[in-house]
């Protein structure tokens, strides 16, 4: 028993820093204001990858893969004059077209923090993998981006002054395709 007590005391002391973090995470004070609005940029919310060399012919049989951002959710925490800490969940839907070469495909996407006026404050790039089960042409996943930190000048600056925007990394041709209103949905009619 005498050996057990010092070991227990050492374990408790070693855990002090993590105990402080746990106590901070259990803070029950209300946020100083609303969380930033979150969503996908309309022109960058979907992507159609055509088979190599077929970009000139935007027809269904040349589609390799498609992707769409279907939902974006933000969770945040901030009190007093502390920075706003947020995380974002992004739901993706994917399609595998007739010209697909494999059972998986990587898509690049970005997450940006902007002022409500549209000025981009920060932008990070990520990759999401579309993994298609055997025989399936549809897939989906949810990606979580943790620890988005938005500094605030003082406690009067609320999360509603910012937006968190998500979109696919698009080539000039893919962006033009989207802006022309063209789209192929591999799940249409299913």
Regions found by a protein language model. Name each.
Residues 17-20:
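Bacterial signal peptide processing site
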Residues 2-9:
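Sec-dependent signal peptide recognition
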Residues 55-56, 63-72, 141-143, 153, ...:
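Scaffold/interface architecture of coatomer-like assemblies
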Residues 71, 76-123:
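Mid-length scaffold segments of soluble, non-membrane domains
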Residues 24-51:
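Post-signal peptide N-terminal segment of mature Sec-exported envelope proteins
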């Amino acid at each position: 028993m005498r050996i057990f007590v010092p070991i227990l005391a050492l374990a408790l002391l070693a855990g002090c820093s993590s105990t402080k973090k746990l106590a901070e995470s259990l803070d029950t004070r209300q946020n100083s204001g609303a969380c930033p609005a979150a969503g996908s940029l309309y022109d960058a919310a979907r992507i159609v990858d055509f088979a190599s060399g077929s970009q000139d012919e935007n027809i269904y049989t040349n589609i390799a893969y498609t992707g769409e951002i279907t939902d974006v959710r933000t969770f945040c925490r901030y009190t007093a004059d502390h920075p706003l800490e947020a995380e974002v969940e992004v739901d993706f839907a994917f399609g595998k077209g007739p010209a697909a070469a494999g059972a998986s495909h990587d898509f690049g996407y970005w997450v940006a923090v902007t002022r409500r006026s549209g000025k981009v404050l920060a932008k990070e790039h990520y990759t999401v993998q579309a993994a298609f089960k055997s025989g399936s042409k549809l897939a989906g996943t949810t990606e979580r981006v943790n620890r988005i930190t938005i500094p605030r000048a003082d406690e009067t600056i609320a999360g509603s002054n910012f937006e968190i925007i998500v979109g696919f990394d698009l080539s000039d041709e893919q962006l033009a395709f989207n802006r022309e209103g063209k789209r192929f949905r591999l799940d249409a009619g299913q």
